[in-house]
Amino acid sequence: MTENFILGRNNKLEHELKALADYINIPYSILQPYQSECFVRHYTKGQVIYFSPQESSNIYFLIEGNIIREHYNQNGDVYRYFNKEQVLFPISNLFHPKEVNELCTALTDCTVLGLPRELMAFLCKANDDIFLTLFALINDNEQQHMNYNMALTSKFAKDRIIKLFCHLCQTVGYDQDEFYEIKQFLTIQLMSDMAGISRETAGHIIHELKDEKLVVKDHKNWLVSKHLFNDVCV
């Protein structure tokens, strides 16, 4: 039984490493020699995946689920990153290691592949294709950060909420033809926290959008019409 368990675990790890290899566009054979240094873990909704800098020695590949990464700077400001499956994180300090105060939490049940940050840095130095892919992913990460900040600069609360919906659809939404689907983690309280407005104001704006058939709550998930993006999406 123990041998079967180990075999199953190794097969799972191999499968996820192949998914990572596809994501960064390299042959699986490049990662295969380092399989023993990697791991697959499952997290339940609300569970902390890591808190840096105490746990900043790993890079993670999100296999399934949604996460929120809350980055705290020295002034106490909070920058939030939302991610869905098929993303590598955190990679902003991959090439210039420094302490990063970042809390990563599972918004839904999640499965992640972990590997040492030093291993990924080594692979980048040894393989130009990996370096170029990671560099492009870092740029995408910074663009996401910029879009989030731009949404928060909107003067009017309604525009801010709409732009945040657009931002969330672009980062964690699932394209369903005429609309985007956002999983059940999204709440009015979270939207109000992100927008820097009261829960009452956020709730009133979202109610207006529901009346306009631009936002629908389908059971626990959100359906956001693409018509919402026409004029104000960043």
Curated annotation (Swiss-Prot):
Domain of life of the organism encoding this protein: Bacteria
Binding site for a nucleoside 3',5'-cyclic phosphate: 40-129
Keyword annotations of the record: Activator, cAMP, cAMP-binding, Cytoplasm, DNA-binding, Nucleotide-binding, Transcription, Transcription regulation
Gene3D superfamilies (alphabetical): Jelly Rolls, Winged helix-like DNA-binding domain superfamily/Winged helix DNA-binding domain
Matching Pfam families: cNMP_binding (PF00027)
Positions of the HTH crp-type domain: 155-228
GO cellular component, one term: cytoplasm
Subcellular locations according to the entry: Cytoplasm
Example GO molecular function: cAMP binding
Keyword Membrane assigned: no
Residue ranges flagged as DNA-binding region: 188-207
rRNA processing in keyword set: no
Chief location: cytoplasm
Described purpose of this protein according to its UniProt entry: Positively regulates the expression of the arcABDCR operon under anaerobic conditions, thus playing an essential role in arginine catabolism. May also control the expression of genes encoding proteins which are involved in anaerobic metabolism. Can bind cyclic AMP.
Name the UniProt record assigns to this protein: HTH-type transcriptional regulator ArcR
Species name: Staphylococcus aureus (strain MSSA476)
Organism lineage: Bacteria, Bacillati, Bacillota, Bacilli, Bacillales
Gene assigned in the entry: arcR
